[in-house]
């Protein structure tokens, strides 16, 4: 991420295939208070296992709220949650809004195209003005890696920041809802083989998932994809790298498929979508190479016929829609935990 002194953020630089897996934003851990409590959620990287389990356990308690006649709890009553989405979103923005409302918060969705940012107002000036309106929590999605860190560093002390996806860097709540989904179906992380397939180079979800999986003790994490779409540094994380889909899928318990992020690519990294599907698309035949009870996941949006066949996406081993459902409870848990923390 590039910033000028006013806090304007620029687009991330185009990635090279050998881009390192880790980003260098963390100085200490700005997400935690001096007492080790979660004040902001900016990335899964660097968070202890205890905090990840705290979030997953809290989400477990909120899942039942969905089944109630009155789908509300008063945990954030009187709090103001601002959704600041500088990038398009369907699932993430909607589930954050639902989650905040189920916690009884007041929710403000900032229309970026109609806001003063479209008139040249800097990111920090926007944040300072919203803080002056006594915001309690910012949910931020931004095209620039590191933008939520900038906001957390400069916002008022009482304000909490949740990263809803920043560039290629991180998507921590997606990573957490993926972990919740895996735990729901598989229970024990320490006996699993998990495969992440596709455009890992440009995927903030893949980065968050890998940090979460390794922190939670998954013994074998596999990254599967063409050489042009895998970042450097995966092996140093303990990840097994495969450049052949059939080999990488053998006997895995969990398959996480990723879409091609064409909007973040520069240059011709791949052949056509049809050719990609032939080599890297998850078909029923390829799914049969995995464990018989393997589950199939996808963070969305899906591109059917590119990275996944419709028979798999809609089949009995797919838990893709369950991920969306669980995402509400996980985001309720994250907001409830960070908003209840003070320095």
From Swiss-Prot:
SUPFAM superfamilies: Aspartate/ornithine carbamoyltransferase (SSF53671). Belongs to the aspartate/ornithine carbamoyltransferase superfamily. ATCase family. GO terms for cellular component: cytosol. Carbamoyl phosphate binds at residues 91-92, 141, 171, 174, 300-301. The gene is pyrB. This is Aspartate carbamoyltransferase catalytic subunit. Catalyzes the condensation of carbamoyl phosphate and aspartate to form carbamoyl aspartate and inorganic phosphate, the committed step in the de novo pyrimidine nucleotide biosynthesis pathway. It comes from Burkholderia mallei (strain ATCC 23344). Heterododecamer (2C3:3R2) of six catalytic PyrB chains organized as two trimers (C3), and six regulatory PyrI chains organized as three dimers (R2). The keyword Transferase applies. NCBIfam families: asp_carb_tr, PRK00856.1. Its EC number is 2.1.3.2. PANTHER family: ASPARTATE CARBAMOYLTRANSFERASE, ORNITHINE CARBAMOYLTRANSFERASE, MITOCHONDRIAL. GO terms for biological process: 'de novo' pyrimidine nucleobase biosynthetic process; 'de novo' UMP biosynthetic process; amino acid metabolic process. Pathway: Pyrimidine metabolism; UMP biosynthesis via de novo pathway; (S)-dihydroorotate from bicarbonate: step 2/3. L-aspartate binds at residues 119, 204, 259. It catalyses: carbamoyl phosphate + L-aspartate = N-carbamoyl-L-aspartate + phosphate + H(+).
């Amino acid at each position: 991420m590039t910033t000028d002194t006013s806090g304007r953020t620029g687009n991330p630089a185009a990635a090279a295939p050998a881009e390192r897996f880790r980003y260098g934003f963390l100085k200490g851990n700005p997400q935690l208070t001096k007492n080790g409590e979660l004040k902001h959620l900016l990335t899964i990287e660097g968070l202890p296992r205890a905090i990840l389990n705290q979030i997953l356990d809290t989400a477990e308690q909120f899942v039942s709220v969905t089944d109630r006649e009155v789908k509300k709890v008063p945990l954030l009553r009187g709090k103001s949650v601002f959704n600041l989405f500088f990038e398009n979103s369907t699932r993430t923005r909607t589930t954050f809004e639902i989650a905040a409302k189920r916690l009884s918060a007041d929710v403000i969705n900032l229309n970026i195209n109609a806001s003063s940012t479209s008139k040249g107002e800097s990111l920090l000036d926007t944040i300072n003005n919203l803080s002056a309106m006594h915001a309690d929590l910012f949910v931020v999605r931004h095209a620039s890696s590191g933008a939520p860190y900038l906001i957390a560093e400069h916002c008022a002390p009482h304000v909490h920041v949740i990263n809803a996806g920043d560039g290629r860097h991180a998507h921590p709540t997606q990573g957490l809802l993926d972990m919740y989904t895996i735990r729901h179906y598989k229970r024990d992380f320490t006996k699993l083989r998990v495969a992440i397939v596709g455009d890992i180079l440009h995927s903030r979800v893949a980065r968050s998932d890998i940090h979460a999986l390794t922190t939670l003790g998954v013994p074998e994490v596999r990254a599967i994809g063409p050489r042009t779409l895998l970042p450097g540094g995966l092996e140093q994380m303990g990840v097994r790298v495969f450049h052949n889909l059939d080999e990488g899928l053998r006997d895995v318990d969990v398959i996480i498929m990723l879409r091609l992020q064409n909007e973040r690519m520069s240059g011709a990294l791949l052949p056509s979508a049809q050719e990609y599907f032939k080599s890297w698309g998850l078909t029923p035949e390829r799914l049969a190479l995995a464990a018989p009870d393997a589950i199939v996941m996808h963070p969305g949006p899906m591109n059917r016929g590119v990275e996944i066949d419709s028979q798999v996406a809609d089949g009995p081993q797919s838990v893709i829609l369950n991920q969306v459902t669980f995402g509400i409870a996980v985001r309720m848990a994250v907001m409830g935990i960070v908003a209840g923390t003070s320095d």
